[in-house]
Structure formats: C-alpha cells, structure tokens
Amino acid sequence: MLDLFNKTSQVQGRISAWLASNNLPHRPLGFDYQGVETLQIKPEDWPSIAVALYVNGFNYLRCQCGYDVYPGGPLASVYYLTKVDDNVDQPEEVCIKIFVPRENPKIPSIFWVWKTADYQERETYDMLGIVYESHPNLKRILMPESWLGWPLRKDYITPDFYELQDAY
C-alpha cells in the first residue's frame, strides 16, 4: 500500500513543489479531470501538513469522505481543500488522500484545523470504521450506536434482519 510512497512517477504540481521545498513528506498522484492536484500523505504526517496547508491559505475544507479501495485492501480518507481569497475567479484546490490498513485504521483528526471536519469525519467513521484520533466527539452519526460493522466496506455482510423501531 505505502511501499511505493517515496517513488514519484507523477508530475509535481505547484503545491507538491511547495511541500517538497519545505521538506514535508508526500507523494504526488497527478491531477484529476478538473486539474485539481492530488497528493498522498502518510497518516503520521497529516497533522503537520494540514497546519502547513492552512497557514499557506487553504482555509476551507470543502469535503471530506472515505472509500474502501478494494475488498480486503486499504481504506482511504480523502480531503478536498480550497484556498478561498478575495477577488479570485478560480480558487486553488488540492485533494489529499490518506491510505490506512483496514485492520485498526487510524488517522489523526484535523477537526482542530478545520472545524467543518466534525460531522464529515464522524460520517466516515460511521460508514467505514476509520478512527480519527483526537476527534472530540467520534461516535456514530447515521447508524444506531448498537449497529455492528461498517456498511460501506466492500466485505460488509448485510444482516438478514433489521429491527425497526416506531418513533411513537
């Protein structure tokens, strides 16, 4: 999963070059179809890189989500950051991907950098089981607290019986 982390085969963008000039470890993954630069970050490096990006002007966490890469494989947490500035027609964006093993998946929470990560990290925890360390209220947000398993994992087995509770 991360054994190719230091091998760079993608073209570096502006943000990747800036991170490299500041000796911040990352791996460029190229650009998406809209031209947004995508970077891979290791979980242990995420807090310092998140703060560096925030200080560099990426003041808006547009979206945080997660996905199961393939059955039995790693889980991914994805962050879309935007540099919101006055009088800018095209705001600068970056996509950060963090891959973790499905056994004991842990990533440091960036709630303390971008408050909008609160519910988004909770939803990813609820659906995929990625634990966001130091999150102030990491508990299920969509599923009942008694729910077993992580519904968006590709190896999730749907229960045969659901107990429906009447609201009245």
Swiss-Prot record:
Pfam families: Complex1_30kDa. It is a peripheral membrane protein. One of its GO terms (biological process) is photosynthesis, light reaction. Its main location: plastid. One of its GO terms (cellular component) is chloroplast thylakoid membrane. Keywords: Chloroplast, Membrane, NAD, NADP, Plastid, Plastoquinone, Quinone, Thylakoid, Translocase, Transport. It is found in: Plastid, Chloroplast thylakoid membrane. GO terms for molecular function: NADH dehydrogenase (ubiquinone) activity; quinone binding. NDH is composed of at least 16 different subunits, 5 of which are encoded in the nucleus. NDH shuttles electrons from NAD(P)H:plastoquinone, via FMN and iron-sulfur (Fe-S) centers, to quinones in the photosynthetic chain and possibly in a chloroplast respiratory chain. The immediate electron acceptor for the enzyme in this species is believed to be plastoquinone. Couples the redox reaction to proton translocation, and thus conserves the redox energy in a proton gradient. PANTHER family: NADH DEHYDROGENASE [UBIQUINONE] IRON-SULFUR PROTEIN 3, MITOCHONDRIAL (PTHR10884:SF14), NADH DEHYDROGENASE UBIQUINONE IRON-SULFUR PROTEIN 3 (PTHR10884). Belongs to the complex I 30 kDa subunit family. This is NAD(P)H-quinone oxidoreductase subunit J, chloroplastic. It comes from Chaetosphaeridium globosum.
